[in-house]
Amino acid sequence: MQLFDLPLDQLQTYKPEKTAPKDFSEFWKLSLEELAKVQAEPDLQPVDYPADGVKVYRLTYKSFGNARITGWYAVPDKEGPHPAIVKYHGYNASYDGEIHEMVNWALHGYATFGMLVRGQQSSEDTSISPHGHALGWMTKGILDKDTYYYRGVYLDAVRALEVISSFDEVDETRIGVTGGSQGGGLTIAAAALSDIPKAAVADYPYLSNFERAIDVALEQPYLEINSFFRRNGSPETEVQAMKTLSYFDIMNLADRVKVPVLMSIGLIDKVTPPSTVFAAYNHLETKKELKVYRYFGHEYIPAFQTEKLAFFKQHLKG
Protein backbone atom coordinates (compact mmCIF):
# COMPACT_ATOMS: atom_id res chain seq x y z
CA MET A 1 0.00 0.00 0.00
CA GLN A 2 1.22 3.50 -0.83
CA LEU A 3 1.16 5.26 2.54
CA PHE A 4 1.25 9.06 2.30
CA ASP A 5 -0.59 9.95 5.51
CA LEU A 6 -0.25 8.74 9.10
CA PRO A 7 -0.11 5.01 9.91
CA LEU A 8 -3.43 3.50 10.95
CA ASP A 9 -2.54 3.23 14.64
CA GLN A 10 -1.79 6.97 14.72
CA LEU A 11 -4.89 7.81 12.71
CA GLN A 12 -7.08 6.04 15.25
CA THR A 13 -5.96 8.46 17.97
CA TYR A 14 -5.54 11.55 15.78
CA LYS A 15 -7.66 14.26 17.39
CA PRO A 16 -6.31 17.76 16.73
CA GLU A 17 -7.56 20.63 18.84
CA LYS A 18 -10.67 22.26 17.49
CA THR A 19 -10.16 25.64 15.84
CA ALA A 20 -13.67 27.02 16.41
CA PRO A 21 -13.64 30.78 17.19
CA LYS A 22 -15.36 32.10 20.33
CA ASP A 23 -18.41 33.23 18.36
CA PHE A 24 -18.76 29.91 16.51
CA SER A 25 -22.09 28.91 18.07
CA GLU A 26 -23.48 32.43 17.81
CA PHE A 27 -22.53 32.59 14.13
CA TRP A 28 -24.49 29.46 13.33
CA LYS A 29 -27.42 30.52 15.52
CA LEU A 30 -27.70 33.80 13.60
CA SER A 31 -27.19 32.05 10.25
CA LEU A 32 -30.07 29.67 10.96
CA GLU A 33 -32.22 32.63 11.98
CA GLU A 34 -31.43 34.28 8.64
CA LEU A 35 -32.44 31.10 6.85
CA ALA A 36 -35.73 31.01 8.75
CA LYS A 37 -36.65 34.43 7.33
CA VAL A 38 -36.79 32.93 3.82
CA GLN A 39 -39.98 31.08 2.92
CA ALA A 40 -39.15 27.73 1.30
CA GLU A 41 -41.99 27.74 -1.26
CA PRO A 42 -41.29 24.18 -2.47
CA ASP A 43 -42.34 23.33 -6.00
CA LEU A 44 -42.71 19.79 -7.34
CA GLN A 45 -42.71 19.08 -11.07
CA PRO A 46 -43.43 15.47 -12.15
CA VAL A 47 -40.74 13.74 -14.21
CA ASP A 48 -41.39 10.85 -16.59
CA TYR A 49 -38.91 8.18 -15.50
CA PRO A 50 -38.78 4.59 -16.85
CA ALA A 51 -39.21 2.71 -13.58
CA ASP A 52 -42.22 1.04 -12.01
CA GLY A 53 -43.06 1.44 -8.35
CA VAL A 54 -41.69 4.95 -7.94
CA LYS A 55 -42.78 8.53 -8.61
CA VAL A 56 -40.13 11.08 -9.60
CA TYR A 57 -40.16 14.86 -9.35
CA ARG A 58 -37.96 17.87 -9.87
CA LEU A 59 -38.07 19.64 -6.49
CA THR A 60 -37.15 23.31 -6.16
CA TYR A 61 -37.19 25.46 -3.02
CA LYS A 62 -35.93 28.82 -1.79
CA SER A 63 -33.02 28.96 0.59
CA PHE A 64 -30.45 31.32 2.08
CA GLY A 65 -30.02 34.52 0.07
CA ASN A 66 -33.27 33.68 -1.74
CA ALA A 67 -31.37 31.21 -3.92
CA ARG A 68 -33.53 28.68 -5.77
CA ILE A 69 -32.13 25.25 -4.93
CA THR A 70 -33.20 22.25 -6.95
CA GLY A 71 -32.73 18.51 -7.13
CA TRP A 72 -34.37 15.14 -7.75
CA TYR A 73 -37.06 13.72 -5.50
CA ALA A 74 -38.15 10.08 -5.79
CA VAL A 75 -40.96 8.52 -3.75
CA PRO A 76 -42.23 4.94 -3.47
CA ASP A 77 -45.48 4.65 -5.41
CA LYS A 78 -47.49 3.32 -2.49
CA GLU A 79 -49.19 4.64 0.59
CA GLY A 80 -46.92 6.33 3.13
CA PRO A 81 -45.71 7.82 5.26
CA HIS A 82 -42.24 6.63 4.24
CA PRO A 83 -38.85 6.94 5.87
CA ALA A 84 -36.75 9.44 3.94
CA ILE A 85 -33.18 10.18 2.92
CA VAL A 86 -31.60 13.44 1.85
CA LYS A 87 -28.50 12.91 -0.27
CA TYR A 88 -25.74 15.45 -0.93
CA HIS A 89 -23.35 15.03 -3.87
CA GLY A 90 -19.59 15.36 -4.22
CA TYR A 91 -17.72 18.48 -5.26
CA ASN A 92 -18.78 19.43 -8.78
CA ALA A 93 -19.71 15.80 -9.23
CA SER A 94 -23.43 15.76 -9.91
CA TYR A 95 -25.07 15.18 -13.26
CA ASP A 96 -28.72 15.02 -14.20
CA GLY A 97 -28.15 11.33 -14.82
CA GLU A 98 -27.69 10.78 -11.07
CA ILE A 99 -31.45 10.78 -10.78
CA HIS A 100 -31.10 6.98 -10.81
CA GLU A 101 -29.52 7.08 -7.34
CA MET A 102 -32.62 8.66 -5.85
CA VAL A 103 -34.80 6.17 -7.73
CA ASN A 104 -32.72 3.31 -6.35
CA TRP A 105 -33.25 4.50 -2.77
CA ALA A 106 -36.98 4.96 -3.44
CA LEU A 107 -37.18 1.37 -4.68
CA HIS A 108 -35.73 0.38 -1.30
CA GLY A 109 -38.66 2.16 0.35
CA TYR A 110 -37.26 5.63 1.08
CA ALA A 111 -38.61 8.96 -0.12
CA THR A 112 -35.32 10.42 -1.34
CA PHE A 113 -34.17 13.91 -2.28
CA GLY A 114 -30.84 14.53 -3.98
CA MET A 115 -29.94 18.19 -3.46
CA LEU A 116 -27.92 19.85 -6.23
CA VAL A 117 -25.37 22.13 -4.55
CA ARG A 118 -25.67 25.81 -5.41
CA GLY A 119 -23.57 26.84 -8.39
CA GLN A 120 -22.23 23.34 -9.05
CA GLN A 121 -25.18 22.20 -11.13
CA SER A 122 -28.54 23.79 -11.85
CA SER A 123 -29.12 25.29 -8.39
CA GLU A 124 -28.82 29.06 -8.17
CA ASP A 125 -25.81 30.60 -6.43
CA THR A 126 -26.48 34.07 -4.99
CA SER A 127 -23.28 34.29 -2.95
CA ILE A 128 -20.65 36.90 -3.81
CA SER A 129 -16.87 37.01 -3.69
CA PRO A 130 -15.85 40.64 -3.09
CA HIS A 131 -12.12 39.81 -3.01
CA GLY A 132 -11.99 37.38 -5.94
CA HIS A 133 -11.21 33.70 -5.63
CA ALA A 134 -9.26 30.81 -7.15
CA LEU A 135 -10.74 28.45 -9.74
CA GLY A 136 -13.68 26.57 -8.24
CA TRP A 137 -15.75 27.33 -5.14
CA MET A 138 -13.43 26.63 -2.20
CA THR A 139 -12.21 30.23 -1.91
CA LYS A 140 -15.32 32.11 -3.00
CA GLY A 141 -15.89 34.82 -0.38
CA ILE A 142 -13.22 33.22 1.81
CA LEU A 143 -12.09 36.42 3.54
CA ASP A 144 -15.36 36.88 5.42
CA LYS A 145 -17.40 34.23 7.22
CA ASP A 146 -20.61 36.01 6.22
CA THR A 147 -19.84 35.91 2.49
CA TYR A 148 -18.12 32.53 2.33
CA TYR A 149 -19.65 30.21 -0.24
CA TYR A 150 -20.19 27.28 2.09
CA ARG A 151 -22.33 29.33 4.46
CA GLY A 152 -25.07 29.17 1.86
CA VAL A 153 -24.36 25.54 1.00
CA TYR A 154 -24.61 24.36 4.63
CA LEU A 155 -27.86 26.27 5.07
CA ASP A 156 -29.21 24.84 1.80
CA ALA A 157 -28.54 21.38 3.23
CA VAL A 158 -30.54 22.24 6.35
CA ARG A 159 -33.38 23.71 4.29
CA ALA A 160 -33.55 20.48 2.24
CA LEU A 161 -34.33 18.61 5.45
CA GLU A 162 -36.96 21.14 6.46
CA VAL A 163 -38.69 20.81 3.09
CA ILE A 164 -38.66 17.01 2.97
CA SER A 165 -39.89 16.70 6.55
CA SER A 166 -42.91 18.87 5.67
CA PHE A 167 -44.24 16.49 3.00
CA ASP A 168 -47.29 14.38 3.90
CA GLU A 169 -45.80 11.21 2.40
CA VAL A 170 -42.71 11.48 4.63
CA ASP A 171 -42.44 10.24 8.21
CA GLU A 172 -40.63 13.19 9.78
CA THR A 173 -39.36 10.99 12.62
CA ARG A 174 -37.42 8.72 10.23
CA ILE A 175 -35.17 10.88 8.06
CA GLY A 176 -31.52 10.17 7.31
CA VAL A 177 -28.74 12.09 5.57
CA THR A 178 -25.95 10.76 3.39
CA GLY A 179 -23.33 11.73 0.84
CA GLY A 180 -19.74 11.25 -0.23
CA SER A 181 -16.76 13.61 -0.17
CA GLN A 182 -18.30 17.11 -0.24
CA GLY A 183 -21.60 15.31 0.32
CA GLY A 184 -20.10 13.56 3.33
CA GLY A 185 -19.08 16.90 4.78
CA LEU A 186 -22.58 18.26 4.18
CA THR A 187 -23.98 15.16 5.87
CA ILE A 188 -22.09 15.94 9.08
CA ALA A 189 -22.88 19.66 8.83
CA ALA A 190 -26.60 19.00 8.33
CA ALA A 191 -26.70 16.55 11.23
CA ALA A 192 -24.95 19.13 13.41
CA LEU A 193 -27.11 22.11 12.45
CA SER A 194 -30.53 20.43 12.28
CA ASP A 195 -32.41 18.19 14.69
CA ILE A 196 -34.39 16.60 11.84
CA PRO A 197 -31.99 13.76 10.84
CA LYS A 198 -32.12 10.57 12.88
CA ALA A 199 -29.11 8.87 11.25
CA ALA A 200 -26.15 9.94 9.11
CA VAL A 201 -23.85 8.10 6.70
CA ALA A 202 -20.79 9.98 5.42
CA ASP A 203 -18.50 8.48 2.78
CA TYR A 204 -14.94 9.89 3.14
CA PRO A 205 -16.19 13.35 4.24
CA TYR A 206 -14.59 16.50 2.87
CA LEU A 207 -14.40 19.96 4.51
CA SER A 208 -12.53 18.77 7.60
CA ASN A 209 -9.34 19.75 9.43
CA PHE A 210 -8.47 22.42 6.86
CA GLU A 211 -5.13 23.27 8.46
CA ARG A 212 -3.83 19.75 7.85
CA ALA A 213 -5.72 19.21 4.61
CA ILE A 214 -3.87 21.98 2.76
CA ASP A 215 -0.57 20.42 3.82
CA VAL A 216 -1.20 16.77 2.94
CA ALA A 217 -3.89 16.62 0.22
CA LEU A 218 -2.34 15.66 -3.12
CA GLU A 219 -5.33 16.37 -5.35
CA GLN A 220 -8.06 18.96 -5.76
CA PRO A 221 -10.21 20.55 -4.43
CA TYR A 222 -8.39 21.36 -1.17
CA LEU A 223 -5.53 22.58 -3.37
CA GLU A 224 -7.73 25.46 -4.56
CA ILE A 225 -7.00 27.01 -1.16
CA ASN A 226 -3.25 26.62 -1.70
CA SER A 227 -3.62 28.24 -5.12
CA PHE A 228 -5.45 31.19 -3.57
CA PHE A 229 -2.62 31.68 -1.07
CA ARG A 230 -0.03 31.53 -3.87
CA ARG A 231 -1.84 34.30 -5.72
CA ASN A 232 -2.44 36.37 -2.62
CA GLY A 233 0.91 36.31 -0.88
CA SER A 234 -0.01 38.45 2.14
CA PRO A 235 0.33 36.54 5.45
CA GLU A 236 -2.65 38.51 6.74
CA THR A 237 -4.77 37.13 3.90
CA GLU A 238 -3.91 33.56 4.85
CA VAL A 239 -4.67 34.18 8.52
CA GLN A 240 -8.06 35.67 7.70
CA ALA A 241 -8.93 32.92 5.23
CA MET A 242 -8.08 30.17 7.71
CA LYS A 243 -10.19 31.91 10.35
CA THR A 244 -13.12 31.92 7.94
CA LEU A 245 -12.65 28.23 7.18
CA SER A 246 -12.73 27.41 10.89
CA TYR A 247 -16.44 28.29 10.99
CA PHE A 248 -17.12 25.64 8.34
CA ASP A 249 -14.74 22.90 9.47
CA ILE A 250 -16.85 19.82 10.19
CA MET A 251 -14.27 18.88 12.81
CA ASN A 252 -15.58 21.89 14.76
CA LEU A 253 -19.21 20.91 14.15
CA ALA A 254 -18.80 17.22 14.97
CA ASP A 255 -19.58 17.39 18.69
CA ARG A 256 -22.98 18.92 17.89
CA VAL A 257 -24.11 15.73 16.10
CA LYS A 258 -26.43 13.72 18.35
CA VAL A 259 -27.53 10.91 16.01
CA PRO A 260 -25.82 7.63 15.03
CA VAL A 261 -23.11 8.10 12.39
CA LEU A 262 -21.54 5.63 9.97
CA MET A 263 -18.45 6.82 8.13
CA SER A 264 -15.93 5.41 5.65
CA ILE A 265 -12.39 6.19 4.52
CA GLY A 266 -9.87 4.63 2.16
CA LEU A 267 -6.29 4.75 3.41
CA ILE A 268 -4.92 5.82 0.02
CA ASP A 269 -7.38 8.69 -0.41
CA LYS A 270 -5.43 11.64 -1.82
CA VAL A 271 -8.46 13.94 -2.04
CA THR A 272 -9.76 13.67 1.52
CA PRO A 273 -6.66 12.45 3.36
CA PRO A 274 -7.41 9.85 6.05
CA SER A 275 -6.15 12.05 8.88
CA THR A 276 -8.68 14.76 8.03
CA VAL A 277 -11.50 12.22 8.15
CA PHE A 278 -10.30 10.78 11.45
CA ALA A 279 -10.12 14.34 12.81
CA ALA A 280 -13.86 14.76 12.31
CA TYR A 281 -14.68 11.22 13.38
CA ASN A 282 -12.70 11.40 16.61
CA HIS A 283 -14.51 14.60 17.61
CA LEU A 284 -17.93 12.96 17.25
CA GLU A 285 -19.50 12.38 20.66
CA THR A 286 -22.34 10.14 19.55
CA LYS A 287 -22.81 6.50 18.62
CA LYS A 288 -20.46 6.04 15.68
CA GLU A 289 -18.56 3.62 13.49
CA LEU A 290 -15.82 4.18 10.92
CA LYS A 291 -15.22 1.58 8.21
CA VAL A 292 -11.60 1.65 7.03
CA TYR A 293 -10.74 0.34 3.55
CA ARG A 294 -7.00 -0.13 3.41
CA TYR A 295 -6.61 -0.51 -0.35
CA PHE A 296 -9.12 2.08 -1.55
CA GLY A 297 -8.73 5.72 -2.43
CA HIS A 298 -11.28 8.44 -3.18
CA GLU A 299 -13.63 6.16 -5.06
CA TYR A 300 -16.75 4.06 -5.02
CA ILE A 301 -16.34 1.40 -2.33
CA PRO A 302 -18.73 -1.49 -3.10
CA ALA A 303 -18.65 -3.09 0.35
CA PHE A 304 -19.64 0.16 2.01
CA GLN A 305 -22.86 0.39 0.01
CA THR A 306 -24.13 -2.74 1.74
CA GLU A 307 -23.09 -1.32 5.11
CA LYS A 308 -25.02 1.86 4.29
CA LEU A 309 -28.20 -0.03 3.40
CA ALA A 310 -28.01 -2.07 6.60
CA PHE A 311 -27.38 1.03 8.72
CA PHE A 312 -30.38 2.93 7.37
CA LYS A 313 -32.57 -0.17 7.64
CA GLN A 314 -31.64 -0.43 11.31
CA HIS A 315 -32.11 3.23 12.20
CA LEU A 316 -34.92 4.32 9.88
CA LYS A 317 -36.93 1.13 9.47
CA GLY A 318 -36.09 -0.91 12.56
Swiss-Prot record:
Cytoplasm found in the keyword field: yes
Biological process, per Gene Ontology: cellulose catabolic process; polysaccharide metabolic process
Effect in UniProt of substituting S181A: Loss of activity
GO molecular function: acetylxylan esterase activity; carboxylic ester hydrolase activity; cephalosporin-C deacetylase activity
EC number: 3.1.1.41, 3.1.1.72
Domain of life where this protein originates: Bacteria
Keyword Cytoplasm: yes
Disulfide bonds, paired cysteine numbers: none
Cellular component per GO, a single term: cytoplasm
Top EC class, one word: hydrolase
Biotech relevance: Used in the pharmaceutical industry for the chemoenzymatic deacetylation of cephalosporins and the synthesis of novel antibiotics.
Cell compartments where the protein resides: Cytoplasm
Keywords: Carbohydrate metabolism, Cellulose degradation, Cytoplasm, Hydrolase, Polysaccharide degradation, Serine esterase
Active site: S181, D269, H298
Self-association and partners: Homohexamer.
Protein family membership: Belongs to the carbohydrate esterase 7 family.
The name this protein goes by in its record: Cephalosporin-C deacetylase
Organism for this UniProt entry: Bacillus subtilis (strain 168)
